[in-house]
């Protein structure tokens, strides 16, 4: 049994050494630059490129979709902005139809209705090929943008060498359950440690899908590769954000992170959907890691350490945990060294995160360690053994129809008209009424909510079986800007 104890101690010691080096260097590079290009650009840059915002949605809750679209409509961007909402063959179009009607007369909004569910990637591509802006912002349909997100991402994209940039993600439903609180802290660490350090070298390895901006000229070069991703002869239908980011880096473009472009997204509130999400992400990470390895010689040495730390670290932790468990079950002896080392590493990381974020709640992130060891590490092992499986686990994807009668339906607004209808007029009234909340929202980063009642006689039951009678719409806290043509 000495072999098990030695294996466990050696693996956990190696894990501690690797993690200490990796996290220390990461924390050093993750510190914000003293003179950021964003600060300098705010005074010098005057070019305002056209931006196309793409919102793919599939069976989205109407309340959530309304909040997303209203946050986009309330952007303070000074340039031209067009919004393309892509309904990816949703079965609940009758339910979301009132949300569409709110923006049906806004010349900035267009709706692309796909006949069948073809997946997020092809839904994005349908909108990209229907649009023409200089920059393309992808926004998930369950994401709410702060009012200045488009402006700040555009400022970062002023350098033609930058192909993509992402904003900081937070959990909009953070206070819902203990799990959503953990995920919110996980997002903060992923953005402000991992992405921030990678951005120091212009090589963010994954510009997250909920809020990522791309340069159209770069997309034009990569769109065919992006659309036709295959793994072991099978089409890959998830992990589109990571794959597109890797393609950008492979083509020689830089990828950046903008920490003050805040986007709040809905995160899983229970373990089952969370584990399904983590399984998809693990598969896409392993697939694209093979591509990332080929890029490392062309990137800074830190990126090599980053890839090694993210892949070898979990492996060492898994080996030490398995050996410690076997030692406990077979020999009956407690693996003190392994347990104390993991506990010490967890405590130090959580304390450092609490100091950097200036929030004591990060001490509670220590709860993530047992979840990682007991659930996520076995899940990653399963993902590695099932890399060829491209199932979303939550929906089925079909091929894009090619028959003439089943082409995507694009509903363009009637240009020159202001939002009409009871819902549209009421929404504009609510915008004007709550201007004063803008300063409070900016101080506390709270998204004000207004209730918008839509007069309609036809509703379909939502997921809970109840007939919705209210749509909650996020409202901007400034006067609506006149539509730009």
Curated annotation (Swiss-Prot):
It comes from the Bacteria. GO terms for cellular component: plasma membrane. InterPro entries: Chitooligosach_Synthase_NodC (IPR026463), Glyco_trans_2-like (IPR001173), Nucleotide-diphossugar_trans (IPR029044). GO terms for molecular function: hyaluronan synthase activity. Changing residue 98 to L: In strain: USDA 142, USDA 136 and USDA 122. Keywords: Cell membrane, Glycosyltransferase, Membrane, Nodulation, Transferase. Belongs to the NodC/HAS family. May be involved in the synthesis of NodRm-1, a sulfated N-acyl-beta-1,4-tetrasaccharide of N-acetylglucosamine which initiates a series of events in the host plant species leading eventually to nodulation. This is N-acetylglucosaminyltransferase. It comes from Bradyrhizobium diazoefficiens (strain JCM 10833 / BCRC 13528 / IAM 13628 / NBRC 14792 / USDA 110).
């Amino acid at each position: 049994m000495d072999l098990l104890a030695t294996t466990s101690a050696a693996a956990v010691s190696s894990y501690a050494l690797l993690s200490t080096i990796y996290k220390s260097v990461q924390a050093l590079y993750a510190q914000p630059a003293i003179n950021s290009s964003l600060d300098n650009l705010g005074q010098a840059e005057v070019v305002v490129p056209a931006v196309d915002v793409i919102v793919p949605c599939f069976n989205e809750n109407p309340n959530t979709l309304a909040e997303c679209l209203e946050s986009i409509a309330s952007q303070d961007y000074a340039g031209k902005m067009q919004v393309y909402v892509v309904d990816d063959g949703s079965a609940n179009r009758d339910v979301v139809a009132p949300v569409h009607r709110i923006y049906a007369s806004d010349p900035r909004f267009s709706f692309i209705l796909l006949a069948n569910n073809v997946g997020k990637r092809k839904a994005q591509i349908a909108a990209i090929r229907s649009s023409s802006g200089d920059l393309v912002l992808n926004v998930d349909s369950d994401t709410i943008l702060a009012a200045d997100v488009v402006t700040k991402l555009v400022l970062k994209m002023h350098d033609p060498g930058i192909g993509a940039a992402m904003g900081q993600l937070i959990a909009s439903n953070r206070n819902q359950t203990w799990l959503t609180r953990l995920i919110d802290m996980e997002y903060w660490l992923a953005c402000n440690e991992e992405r921030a350090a990678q951005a120091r070298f212009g090589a963010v390895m994954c510009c997250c899908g909920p809020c990522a901006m791309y340069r159209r000229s770069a997309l034009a070069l990569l769109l065919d590769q992006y659309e036709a991703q295959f793994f072991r002869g099978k089409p890959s239908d998830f992990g589109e954000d990571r794959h597109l980011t890797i393609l950008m880096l492979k083509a020689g473009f830089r990828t950046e992170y903008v920490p003050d472009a805040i986007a709040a997204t809905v995160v899983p509130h229970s373990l089952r959907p969370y584990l399904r999400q983590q399984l998809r992400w693990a598969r896409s990470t392993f697939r694209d890691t093979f591509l990332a390895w080929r890029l490392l010689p062309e990137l800074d040495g830190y990126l090599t350490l980053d890839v090694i730390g993210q892949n070898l670290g979990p492996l060492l932790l898994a080996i030490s945990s398995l050996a410690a468990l076997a030692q406990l079950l077979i020999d009956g002896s407690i693996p003190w060294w392994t347990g104390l080392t993991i506990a010490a590493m967890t405590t130090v990381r959580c304390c450092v995160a609490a100091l950097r974020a200036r929030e004591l709640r990060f001490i509670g992130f220590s709860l993530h360690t047992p979840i990682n060891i007991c659930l996520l590490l076995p899940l990653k092992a399963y993902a590695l053994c099932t890399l060829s499986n491209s199932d979303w686990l939550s929906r089925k994807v079909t091929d894009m129809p090619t028959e003439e009668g089943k082409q995507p339906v694009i509903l363009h607004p009637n240009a020159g008209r202001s939002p009409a209808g009871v819902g549209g007029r009421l929404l504009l009234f609510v915008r004007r009424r709550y201007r004063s909340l803008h300063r409070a929202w900016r101080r506390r980063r709270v998204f004000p909510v207004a209730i918008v009642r839509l007069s309609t006689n036809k509703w379909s039951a939502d997921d809970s079986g109840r007939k919705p009678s209210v749509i909650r719409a996020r409202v901007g806290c400034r006067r609506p800007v006149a539509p730009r043509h």
